[in-house]
Structures are given as C-alpha cells and as structure tokens.
From Swiss-Prot:
Name of the protein described by the UniProt record: S-adenosylmethionine synthase
Positions of Mg(2+) binding: D17
Sequence positions that bind ATP: H15, D164, A165, K166, R230, F231, D239, R245, K246, A262, K266
GO molecular function, one term: magnesium ion binding
Localization (cell): Cytoplasm
Source organism per UniProt: Mannheimia succiniciproducens (strain KCTC 0769BP / MBEL55E)
List of residues binding K(+): E43
Record text on cofactor binding: Binds 2 divalent ions per subunit.
Amino acid sequence: MSSYLFTSESVSEGHPDKIADQISDAVLDEILKQDPKARVACETYVKTGMALVGGEITTSAWVDIEYIARQVICDIGYTSSEMGFDGHSCAVLNGIGKQSSDINQGVDRDDPLNQGAGDQGIMFGYATNETEVLMPAAITYAHRLMERQAWVRKNGTLPWLRPDAKSQVTLKYENNKIVGVDAVVLSTQHSDSVTQEDLHEAVMEEIIKPVLPAKWLSKDTKYFINPTGRFVIGGPMGDCGLTGRKIIVDTYGGAARHGGGAFSGKDPSKVDRSAAYAARYVAKNIVAAGLADRCEIQLSYAIGVAEPTSIMVETFGTGKVADELLVALVREHFDLRPYGLIKMLDLIKPIYRETAAYGHFGREQFPWEKTDRAAELKAAAGL
C-alpha cells in the first residue's frame, strides 16, 4: 500500500502580497469598465504607511488610482493606524507608464481572431476529481480556512482577529485516496487584547472545525495554531507586499506544474493569465466528462503569434482514452488563440478583483469553471 503526505498553503486577503494583488486587479477592473480594449500591466508594492502602484497601461479610460487603492485597503479591514496600515491615511504613489508600441504592433490586428499573444510563455491548467469542484483537496481546504477567518473577523464573531493570516493543510493519502488530515497550520494576526489560550480555542472551534471534514480529523491530527505565539504586528507593517508573489497559492497549491507567470493586474491579452484560465477550463471539462480522473494541460505561445506553439495533455495513467486523442479533441473543441479564449470565457468583463484572494480556481462564479463542454467531449471520445 502506497502512503504519502501532501501539503498546500493559502494566505488571507489581508496578507501583504494579496493586498497588492487586489489593488492591481481593482485598477484593472475599473479600466475595463470604461475601455474593454485597454492594455494593462499593473503592479503594486505595499509597506508600512504606503502603497506604490506602477506598471504599463495604455487606455482611453481615466481612473482614480489613489481612491481605488484606499478603497481596497479599507475593504480588507486595514482602517486603523494601530494595525500599522490605514487605508484612510496611507500614502498612495502612482508610477504608471504606457505599454511599449513594439508590443502593441505584435498583439493588435485588424481581424481580432488573428490577435497575437502578448508575450511568449508556458501555462498549465489542472483538474482532479478528488473534490466536488475538481480541484486538489489540500489547496481547496487551505483557501476555505482563510475565507472562514475573514468571515468570522468581519461579522464580529471573533472581533479581535486582524486581516493578516496564513493556513496550511497536510493530507494523508493511501493508494492515492485521502484518508485523513495529518496536520493543520493556522496563523492569524490578532489584537493585543486576546490571550493565546482563548485564541487557540476560538480558532479551533470557529475556523478549523467548521471547515475541515470531521471524517478526516482524528486523535492523530496535529494542530499548529499561531505556533510562534504572538502575532500582533502583521500586514504591510510586518512584511512588504508585491503583486504576483503568491502564484502557487493562486493556482493548485503545488499539486500541478506552473509556468511562472503571475495573474493579477494583467488584462486578458496577456496569455500568462488568460491561457492559464483556458487551460484550467479544458482540464476541468476533460475530468468532468469522465475522460480522466486527473488531467494537466500545458499550452505555450510566441509573442505576436495567434496559434499556440504547443498543446500537451497528461492524465497520469488515469485517462480512459489515449492522451494523444485528448490533444486532438482539445484542438477540435477549444479555440485557444488569444482572442478565441477571451471570447470563449468572456474575459473582458471586470471580474478580476474577486479572483485576487482565495484562489483563481475551484470557485464556481468564474467562467473558466464551467463544465459546459463535458458532454460534447465525452460524445466525441466515443464514451
């Protein structure tokens, strides 16, 4: 019997890197509302008392960068100087320029279908049937712990919680099936008023137990709640935050490969983002169709070229048909040119700020999570 452990982590919406991601995507959303053809690459840096928003943006829109950044920071919950970061009073610096005309000429075309990729690169998408949302379980539950932390913080259940937090879930597998939770790590920022004893009990009862399946918890499960003790100094006061530094948290928690490109702050002409969403969409529909228990898709692009330079399908021995047939089905049923996938997934809409915390995948409100191609794929495969 093969037995192994697998671990994934998540971070809260108040983690410094996630503050940066959310500001970048909030700027993108506001621009797309006015100018769907905008070219946006927005990067954010946050540290004690300041947020710097920079990057390259070409658009006919005008947006109030300072207002957007402050609104995001306050929405997250940083509204007091006692936390070391206050959206009302922090400095907001603007360092935005325009996208290179050399890139524009390679991307824009008279016929939108021939729109070139905004850059070269490799992108991966993944799906597995070990959860109902066809995502790896460890990252799914790590995200849910962070969502629960924010919920009990904001609704007043645990008013002494603060926005910065991290989670980590270690699952035990036997014969590739989950048999239990081996360990849970949850570190959360808190006010100075709460005792460690009260914090440990509250986190266990209000965050961990409501989220993790009871059947996976046992006397052998290990819990590490704020294992260093005090966590009063957090957020940008404790660490600087940068857009694009949580790419594994954003995707599959290490259960699948990653091409290296971050998502937040990028408009959908950037295949780092849009093709990664399309690869998830393809992989999820293959698994939903019952053509494999696990599926990983790799796509690659050349700057200024519309057609992908490669498509790979890997089903890790779980495929019901040959991987080569799946590649042919992908080419036949999915338009993976930049404009094709933007149209297929309706990516021009201002939906991106919501993606910037708790993972881009496994959340059914996003269009790349639809399984509307599963039936046609199953029929085309002859199953």
